[in-house]
UniProtKB/Swiss-Prot annotation:
Top EC group: transferase
EC number(s) stated in the UniProt entry for this protein: 2.6.1.9
Reaction catalyzed: L-histidinol phosphate + 2-oxoglutarate = 3-(imidazol-4-yl)-2-oxopropyl phosphate + L-glutamate
Essential cofactor(s): pyridoxal 5'-phosphate
Pathway: Amino-acid biosynthesis; L-histidine biosynthesis; L-histidine from 5-phospho-alpha-D-ribose 1-diphosphate: step 7/9
Protein name per Swiss-Prot or TrEMBL: Histidinol-phosphate aminotransferase 1
Family (UniProt): Belongs to the class-II pyridoxal-phosphate-dependent aminotransferase family. Histidinol-phosphate aminotransferase subfamily.
PTM sites of type N6-(pyridoxal phosphate)lysine: K226
Length: 362
């Protein structure tokens, strides 16, 4: 009998998360120089990190021997989101806070609801607690809130919602989300994952943090990995009622966000010009990519994120041909979409390189 046999059966049954292929890995496999590889697989900001955040990181290095103090970032998030500091939970990326929510509310004998084609971390977080995962059929490749409401059982403790959804980019109109909150049992936590919130057109965007006072069972999760360009530093946060935030903070590791991440995130929240430039680059890039997909006669899913998902036919073959040309995109067969690929919006030259490679791969 091995040590693995002593592990929890539901942990042994979990399939590990498969991230986008790193540039260095493709360079090793294909012998392609790193500088000739274009990675459009992980929804990272093609502009990199905010200049203000970079300066803050450089300044913070001098105090790296000290344990982190989350006060400044919590205060900045509270100011930005209009909540009190005791409603905020910081995480080592938003995946960390998603996992904290699962650990607080899920256990064997309980269940969580999520939508087909939704973010892979929801099943991981759920199944790692021994809880049952209830998957509901997608509607136009996104969430069907009516089906999700119908799937809630007496033992359900969490409903996972990504808005916009990853990997499909679908966006749920805010009135529909609020109407869903009105009918969900008050003892069921609704997790609203807004990793791509800043890519929603400003005229359409609603600050759902203001809803928490009306719906104490709502938890809003956001990240600095996308438009703020801090994916490698790993920092995100949850906004919740004081009661829920307190429970999450009880099991949170004491120093789960490092000094450099805290300094960068505080500065990034003040770099409004960088965020505006990133949004505009994404808007133009989305138009460029979609125009190319239409030119090739490829179906795509309308996206409110910094990526677009398109039907590639034999996606595995197309993906391999792209890799051989030094272009990395994201296969999403693991999300139940074996014929589709997801491409991150890059800079204008990166997008052009992708479209050129895709035309050759089709």
């Amino acid at each position: 009998m091995s040590l693995a046999d002593q592990a929890l059966s539901y942990v042994r049954a979990i399939s590990p998360y498969q991230p986008g292929k790193p540039i260095t890995e493709l360079a090793r496999e294909m012998g392609i120089p790193v500088e000739k590889i274009v990675k459009l697989a992980s929804n990272e900001n093609p502009l990199g990190m905010s200049p203000k955040a970079r300066k803050a990181v450089e300044a913070a290095i001098s105090g790296i021997e000290r344990y982190p103090d989350q006060f400044d970032l919590i205060a900045k998030v509270a100011e930005r989101c209009g909540v009190s500091s005791n409603q905020i939970v910081l995480g080592n990326g938003s995946n960390d806070v998603l996992d904290l929510i699962a650990r607080v509310f899920l256990a064997p004998g309980r269940s969580a609801v999520f939508a087909q084609h939704a973010f892979a971390v929801y099943p991981l977080a759920t199944l790692s607690t021994g809880a049952e995962l209830i998957s509901t059929p997608a509607k136009n490749y996104g969430h069907d809130l009516n089906a999700m409401r119908a799937a809630i059982r007496p033992d359900t403790r969490i409903v996972w919602i990504a808005n916009p959804n990853n990997p499909t980019g679908n966006f749920l109109p805010y009135p529909e989300v609020r109407a869903f909150l009105e009918v969900v049992p008050k003892d069921v936590v609704v997790v609203l994952d807004e990793a791509y919130n800043e890519y929603i057109p400003p005229a359409e965007r609603v600050d759902t943090a203001t809803w928490i006072k009306d719906f104490p069972n709502l938890v809003v999760c956001r990240t600095f990995s996308k438009i703020f360009g801090l994916a490698g530093l790993r920092v995100g946060y949850a906004l919740a009622s004081t009661e829920v935030a307190d429970l999450m903070n009880r099991i949170r590791q004491p120093f789960n966000v490092n000094n450099l991440a805290i300094a960068a995130a505080v500065a990034a929240l003040d770099d409004h010009l960088f965020v505006a430039d990133s949004y505009e680059l994404n808007r133009r890039g989305m138009e460029q990519i979609i125009a190319g997909l239409k030119r090739f006669g490829l179906e795509h899913i309308p996206s409110h994120g910094n990526f677009v998902t398109f039907r590639a036919g034999d996606a595995a073959v197309v993906n391999q041909k792209l890799l051989k040309q030094g272009v990395i995109v994201r296969p999403i067969g693991g999300y139940g979409l074996p014929e589709w690929l997801r491409v991150t919006i890059g800079t204008e030259p990166e997008n052009a390189r992708f479209l050129e490679a895709l035309e050759k791969a089709l």
